[in-house]
Regions:
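Cytoplasmic membrane-interface "Motif A"-like loop-to-helix N-cap segments
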Residues: 70-84
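C-terminal membrane-cytosol helix-exit motif in multi-pass small-molecule transporters
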Residues: 183-202
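Juxtamembrane intracellular "pre-TM" segments in multi-pass secondary transporters
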Residues: 1-7, 200-226
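Helix-loop boundary and gating motifs at the non-cytosolic
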Residues: 1-54, 226
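Glycine-rich segments within core transmembrane alpha-helices of 12-TM secondary carriers
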Residues: 56-58, 144-169
Length: 226
């Protein structure tokens, strides 16, 4: 494999590296504020949202990552995943607060459920498929450079969100905030149709569940300490 990455590959790396991290900034730093300030002041709902989204992200990455390996395909999961990820983020724009205690609790539960749905799509597209694609299209000679660029993206994403979008939340304009971020994420899916090239992987062999458990084998862990 060539050690030099082409412009199309770099375009995909930068696009998904940035757009994906922008979406994760919203999930990690703004959903709890949105839930507390506009839906319910019950902090137990925030704790539930954080816990369930973490579980969803972990399980999804394992299950969908193994599915991607099994199918030998990355592009479809990345493109469709980003499109649905963006739609699920934009859907938060249409959740409204109710003055009734029972309705407010139901709305808070809905936010928690939708956060898990959003996390499922995000973990499928970014954590499982995109990260695997990065490994597929790089080699040890250039992987360090690529990983360095991607490691910077969370900081760039925070600067973009805080600099360009945080004012919307301060003004209480959550609807526009979520629609913009959802649109950016969907745009990533659209661009993926043009930027992402399938690495041409063979279909995975063996049992699907055996592939999921493969990474937990002590011998595999000892053989891959980093």
């Amino acid at each position: 494999m060539k050690t030099r990455l082409g412009g199309r590959t770099w375009a995909a790396l930068l696009t998904f590296g940035l757009f994906g991290q922008i979406a994760w900034v919203i999930e990690n730093m703004y959903f709890n504020v949105f839930l507390y300030n506009t839906i319910s002041g019950n902090t137990s709902m925030i704790a539930a949202m954080v816990a369930w989204s973490a579980v969803t992200a972990t399980v999804t990455t394992l299950v969908m990552g193994a599915l991607s390996d099994r199918l030998g395909r990355r592009k479809a999961l990345i493109v469709i995943g980003y499109l649905l990820w963006g739609v699920s983020i934009g859907a938060f724009a249409f959740i409204k607060r109710s003055p009734l205690a029972g309705a407010a609790h139901s709305a808070a539960v809905l936010v928690v459920v939708m956060d898990c749905v959003m996390t499922f799509f995000g973990s499928t597209a970014n954590d499982a498929a995109f990260n695997a694609w990065v490994t597929d299209v790089t080699v040890p000679e250039n992987r360090g450079r690529v990983e360095t660029v991607l490691a910077i993206m969370p900081l760039v994403a925070m600067l973009v969100v805080f600099g360009a979008l945080d004012g919307l939340t301060q003004a209480g304009n959550w609807r526009l905030f979520f629609l913009i971020v959802g649109g950016i994420t969907c745009l990533g899916g659209v661009l993926g149709c043009f930027f992402i090239r399938e690495p041409g992987l063979p279909r995975g062999q063996g049992s699907y569940f055996a592939n999921i458990l493969y990474g937990f084998r002590p011998a595999v862990i000892r053989g891959n300490p980093r």
